[in-house]
Amino acid sequence: MIANISPLAPSYTPELPAIDGITLRTVCAGYKNWQRNDLSLFLFQPNTVVAGLTTQSACPSPEVEWCRAAIKKGKARALVVNAGNSNAFTGHKGREAVAAITARVADHLKCALHEVFVSSTGVIGVPLPIKTACDGLEKAFSAEDVNWEHMANAIMTTDTFAKMSRQDITIQGKSVKMVGIIKGSGMIAPDMATMLGYIFTDAAVAPELLQKMLTKANKKSFSCITVDSDTSTSDTVLAFATAAAGNPILSSEEDKDADKLQEAVTAICLDLAQQVVRDGEGASKFISVSVNGAVSDESAHIIAMSIANSPLVKTAMAGEDANWGRVVMAVGKAGQPAERDLLSIRFGGIEVAAKGMVVPNYDEAPVAAHLKGKEIDISVDIGLGKGQAQVWTCDLTHGYISINADYRS
């Protein structure tokens, strides 16, 4: 955790409700020489279902490999999250650590191994110490119950604030609660999933439908953000549903009120995703990039991400420089259909370039005023079709360099 809270942090912290069927514990296992909780244990009542998405990195952590296999079974009794050590790229020692953790928890709960999920976050290349993890679990088994804010803080690494969200809906006459927490600040460029994010609900829903809902929500949220274009080896998003709300189980998208659950999952994912961008390492500006007029939505998304990932665009925003030429560059390099003489660009709704050149009588003053704010809007019209997309990123500052240059020290 970093001492100074991001200037883009939300002005309020939502009060998250307890969710029936879930017990929360967190302790200091001591993965680093610090006095903070770094092992979190989520316990679920029997028959809790799970869905999940994991990184598309070619170098996934042992935890990711374990979760990928376990998700297919659709059941969960526990989730363990370790902070301070990602356990990625650690060979057989890393796999042994995951095996030891899942075995210890499964033995304690008298459940199947595949019902125990594990995530780890932190430095890459250092095996997770098995004794430290297992000793931490023993402490967690007998620890006092805590609330969601404790858990959100315990999973953090370079984050500057705890990221939480909630939704309350009614499904077929039953009140349903949904809570989400996430950690992430750097190494953020998701592909299918991102960072470590967890969603919890007391809704009764089939795991297959929950998986569909999470996948849809991901496409509109986690897959639309970037901080530094680096996709983590540990990215994981998991959703757990205890069925404690007592609603008739949802098994199809056509079921009554299934659309309400989908909307809630999407809303929480989008809120959490944008909070991650707002906590981008060293960030001082939250940037929304909209692309319209592309040949397809997919093409628009690729172009938008090219702009959002451009170090030149991001540093221009940090310097409050209306250098729209860098946006032109990012569009041109995206590898998607674009026509120079049809392209138009706006900053804060103000057109700065159109038809292949700067607009006549361009006045930079109102654009400069917009760039001095913390919320920046970049809009591009490709002029070729109806494809559209919106993504979110942050600026690139000296703070990002300082945080990552000193990360291991």
Swiss-Prot record:
Protein name: Arginine biosynthesis bifunctional protein ArgJ
TM helices/strands, residue ranges: none
Organism name: Zymomonas mobilis subsp. mobilis (strain ATCC 31821 / ZM4 / CP4)
GO biological process: L-arginine biosynthetic process; ornithine biosynthetic process
Superkingdom to which the source organism belongs: Bacteria
Site (Cleavage): A193, T194
Gene name as annotated: argJ
One GO cellular component, as annotated: cytoplasm
Record: residues binding substrate: T157, K183, T194, E281, N404, S409
Subcellular location: Cytoplasm
Organism phylogeny: Bacteria, Pseudomonadati, Pseudomonadota, Alphaproteobacteria, Sphingomonadales
Family: Belongs to the ArgJ family.
Keywords attached to this entry: Acyltransferase, Amino-acid biosynthesis, Arginine biosynthesis, Autocatalytic cleavage, Cytoplasm, Multifunctional enzyme, Transferase
Catalysed reactions listed for this entry: N(2)-acetyl-L-ornithine + L-glutamate = N-acetyl-L-glutamate + L-ornithine; L-glutamate + acetyl-CoA = N-acetyl-L-glutamate + CoA + H(+)
Enzyme Commission code: 2.3.1.35, 2.3.1.1
Site (Involved in the stabilization of negative charge on the oxyanion by the formation of the oxyanion hole): T121, G122
InterPro entries in alphabetical order: Arg_biosynth_ArgJ, ArgJ-like_dom_sf, ArgJ_beta_C
